[in-house]
Regions:
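Conserved beta-strand segments that form the floor/walls of ligand-binding pockets within enzyme
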Residues: 17, 23, 80, 113, ...
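Glycine-rich portal/gate segments that line the openings of hydrophobic small-molecule binding cavities
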Residues: 23, 42, 52-109, 119, ...
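Beta-strand elements of well-folded, non-transmembrane domains
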Residues: 26, 70-72, 130-134
Length: 172
């Protein structure tokens, strides 16, 4: 498993980028199916419930809501899938989904990619290209918030890898 691969520095468009990865002992199609099972993300993303609100959840134009919080206290992250690609059978391209965060708190692009490393191994890459809220306050606060945000996402990725591996080995 790897640690955050970017320093949260501005991307060329002024967004803040955060990329985290985790290696999973399961084939790429298995990992892809698990990370894009939107309703199951609450199993591995702390205090988050995700639901599909439009479309099939596996194509451009589909919409999702993710509520992160405890009880009624939290925030709603609304998203639209803007890119969806899966490699053709026999090819080795990545599985990739890009969502546009359209909510009041989280804005920007989120990217999920699964890359095959071997027949029973893959790498899941989660990138956020964030438009920080609150203008200058958000830009000033990002270096303070980023380490905790990255640690939380990395914990979620490790849990996802464990759960995905367990499911895969139980079905073999």
């Amino acid at each position: 498993m790897s640690e955050p691969s970017t320093g949260g520095t501005p991307a060329p468009d002024g967004r803040r980028e955060l990329t985290l990865t985790v290696d999973v002992r399961a084939p790429a199609p298995v990992v892809w199916a698990y990370v894009t099972d939107w309703e199951a993300q609450g199993e591995w993303i702390p205090a988050t419930r995700v639901r599909r609100t439009g479309g099939d959840g596996r194509s451009v134009g589909s919409t999702l809501d993710a509520f992160t919080g405890v009880g009624p206290v939290g925030f709603l992250d609304t998203m639209e899938i803007t890119e969806w690609s899966e490699p053709a059978p026999g090819s080795d391209g990545p599985w990739r989904c890009v969502v546009l965060h359209t909510g009041k708190v989280v804005r920007g692009d989120g990217v999920f990619e699964v890359v095959e490393l071997g027949p029973q191994r893959s790498r899941f890459v989660w990138t956020e290209l964030l438009d920080l809220p609150l203008g200058a306050v958000g830009r000033f606060g990002w270096p303070l918030v980023r380490p905790g945000f990255a640690a939380g996402v990395q914990l979620a990725l490790r849990k996802m890898a464990r759960l995905c591996e367990r499911r895969y080995t139980a079905r073999r």
